[in-house]
Curated annotation (Swiss-Prot):
Protein residues bound to S-adenosyl-L-methionine: 36, 55, 76, 120
Name assigned to this protein: Ubiquinone biosynthesis O-methyltransferase
GO MF entries: 2-polyprenyl-6-hydroxyphenol methylase activity; 3-demethylubiquinol 3-O-methyltransferase activity; polyprenyldihydroxybenzoate methyltransferase activity
Presence of the UniProt keyword Ligase in the record: no
Catalytic activity: a 3-demethylubiquinol + S-adenosyl-L-methionine = a ubiquinol + S-adenosyl-L-homocysteine + H(+); a 3-(all-trans-polyprenyl)benzene-1,2-diol + S-adenosyl-L-methionine = a 2-methoxy-6-(all-trans-polyprenyl)phenol + S-adenosyl-L-homocysteine + H(+)
Pfam families: Methyltransf_23
Organism: Paraburkholderia phytofirmans (strain DSM 17436 / LMG 22146 / PsJN) (Burkholderia phytofirmans)
Phylogenetic placement of the source organism: Bacteria, Pseudomonadati, Pseudomonadota, Betaproteobacteria, Burkholderiales
Keywords: Methyltransferase, S-adenosyl-L-methionine, Transferase, Ubiquinone biosynthesis
Pathways per UniProt: Cofactor biosynthesis; ubiquinone biosynthesis
Keyword S-adenosyl-L-methionine belongs to the record: yes
EC numbers, comma separated: 2.1.1.222, 2.1.1.64
NCBIfam families: UbiG (TIGR01983)
Alphabetical GO biological process terms: methylation
Family: Belongs to the methyltransferase superfamily. UbiG/COQ3 family.
Amino acid sequence: MTNADPHELQKFSDLAHRWWDPNAEFKPLHELNPIRLKWIDAHAHLAGKTVLDIGCGGGILSESMAGLGAHVKGIDLSTQALGVADLHSLESGVTVDYEEIAAEALAAREPAKYDVVTCMEMLEHVPQPAAIVEACKTLVKPGGWVFFSTLNRNVKSYLFAVIGAEYIARMLPKGTHDYARFIRPSELASFVRAADLRTADIKGIVYNPLSKHFMLSADTSVNYMLACRRDV
């Protein structure tokens, strides 16, 4: 059975044509992208590296990493999102290899192939996030980097990421997130340990409503990113 929720897939497939509109439903991803890209590159030095972007959607992060000189493969289970990603890659002239395949299936086919694996804003949308973390460990080379980003599960994250972002500020479509699937840092850390990955860094991302910009922070109470390594 594929580790995917059909409702979640349909939700993002229905919005696929909006991926590259910086003022539409995926505006927060466009605003987040420079911050997460800079953070990933600071750790992994992307130029010349083989990179896998799991849950790549329309390719916002995939193209950005390729633009820094990485050899990027993006995978997703949304046919529509991948179609948009392929088309935008042709238009932009940035080469990314896209494929519709589950992370677990690719892990069985291409173990220890990638220098860097990214899985951003994806874990909170799947039924078994621990299985994705395990697949990431299998896919990355010994000594390589794995990066995750997701949402913490607490009252503040519910108020900010669901009520605030979806219903008040309307930064995201209603129903984008299922609070029950948010993942506490301690839970993600346990998935990482179980997969024999080593946590190297954790950073929060906060939104300033006055400047309307995201920034890195020590505050992991809502959005956060985790950098891990597979030991040699």
